[in-house]
Amino acid sequence: MKKELIIGTRSSPLALWQAEFTKAELSRHFPELNITLKLVKTTGDVLLDSPLSKIGDMGLFTKDIEKHLLAKEIDLAVHSLKDVPTGTPEGLVISSFTKREDTRDVIISKSGKGLKDLPPNARMATSSLRRMSQLLSMRPDLQILDIRGNLNTRFKKFDDGEFDAMMLAYAGVYRLEFSDRISEILPHDVMLPAVGQGALGIETRTDDAETIEIVRVMNDSNTEICCRAERALLRHLQGGCQIPIGCYGSYISGTLKLLAFVGSVDGKTALRNELTKPVNTPEEAEAVGIELAEVLLSMGAEKILADIRKTR
């Protein structure tokens, strides 16, 4: 058994929370392990002046950490799963999918009002094309403003009056104890989350069997089935973090229900569909994701995504 483990992580408050949570859980199961953190600055942390959709690079928040992992400078990397591209680099694998937090998105507004009750032409901040597309399909009057930076930075900009409302993932808001600022939690029939939202992905080297065995104690089988289905759908659509695709899987009593959305950035075109099938393994879940992706492509998703890629 290893005596030491080094966890690679970004240095944002949320990333540190996630890494410390992972460290605490692993220490609980393996008290003899000496576990330390190595902080890594990623491209996404440095390039804060441009919208994420304009940078055009998958793995903005993961690539630099993965370099340290491949170089054996760290033993594992802890990511927000929604930031992890569906094609992991050769030699690396997501070995553990942690139990998922609430996957929904939330509205934080000056008035305390929810999405339907925001004033006409309200300024809404989000860095996500997925959120933008779904927002504009319901409220085409909204002025969508790009926002970058960690959660604390976003709340400061909000408190300084730079916009009227902002949309964030519930999981991050809850983990950093900003829940009292929430104006509305949006249900999935209004706003589908990003693929993998609410879960952590623990990445290891494929040849490091000992570390894989260690981190598997944190794996939640329901979360793995849902997230692998979602990631298979995203992979089949050749989408990434900055494409307007939303997806959510729920797994109850051996049945997987997968909801998915593909839309144009302006919100004028929105495709939604769902698929429910019995599933026993992560591989079967991935097949459901691919099948639903094919349904969306037959509905016209290919043209929507091609048009978006032309403008990037």
UniProtKB/Swiss-Prot annotation:
Pfam families: Porphobil_deam (PF01379), Porphobil_deamC (PF03900). GO terms for molecular function: hydroxymethylbilane synthase activity. Binds 1 dipyrromethane group covalently. It comes from the Bacteria. Its EC number is 2.5.1.61. It catalyses: 4 porphobilinogen + H2O = hydroxymethylbilane + 4 NH4(+). GO terms for biological process: chlorophyll biosynthetic process; protoporphyrinogen IX biosynthetic process. The modification S-(dipyrrolylmethanemethyl)cysteine is found at C241. Belongs to the HMBS family. The porphobilinogen subunits are added to the dipyrromethane group. This is Porphobilinogen deaminase. It comes from Chlorobaculum tepidum (strain ATCC 49652 / DSM 12025 / NBRC 103806 / TLS).
